[in-house]
Amino acid sequence: MGVLLVGGTAFRVWQVARIDDRDKADVVVVLGAAQYAGKPSKVLEARLRKAKLLFDQGVSEYVVTGGGRREGDRYTEAQAGKNWLVRQGVPADRVIEVGQGNDTLGTLRAVADEVKKRGWKTAVIVSDPWHSLRARTMASDAGLDAWTSPTHSGPIVQTRETQAKYILRETAALLYYRATKAGADRIAIDQEVG
């Protein structure tokens, strides 16, 4: 039974990673990842590029950047994300930064609170492909009608070995979340990923 549960979950992580849903939504939500003195890491920049593409395609009129700060940081992941998007031409009044949360669950709960305060309900979540199912599940549990449009570039999707590691990580993290309703981002492979 356990093998079926793990295998089935891994298959769903892989399957949802391939879904790129660009239906119109109230907001595009970019989940945070590491930033260095306000400069997005390669992982975060790949997510931001995807969010800008969705904004430019008219998927939503607003982008929410999420993510807090690590000890010693001057910038939140959300600030670094907003600054990058504005430099790339997204109007500042169309980017909402939510600088709370140091893991996926905390970030999505804070983002959901902000989104719902504005009377919005639907969100396209932008993250890495393997993170999509867990992020969508957490966003739904936080009260959003959410779907995903993952990145398909950046360091997390480069090699089969990297992909396999992240599918295994996300399978474990999703099973842990479903069992406990607690975050599982400490199942770490790479410090750039939030």
What are these regions (language model features)?
Residues 193-194:
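Extracytoplasmic/luminal low-complexity segments enriched in Pro/Gly and acidic/polar residues
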Residues 1-9:
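Hydrophobic membrane-insertion alpha-helices, especially the h-region
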Residues 160-187:
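A transmembrane-helix-recognition feature enriched in membrane-embedded lipid enzymes
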Residues 13-20, 180-188:
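Perimembrane helix-loop junctions in membrane proteins
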Residues 10-168:
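A structural signal for short, hydrophobic/glycine-enriched beta-strand patches
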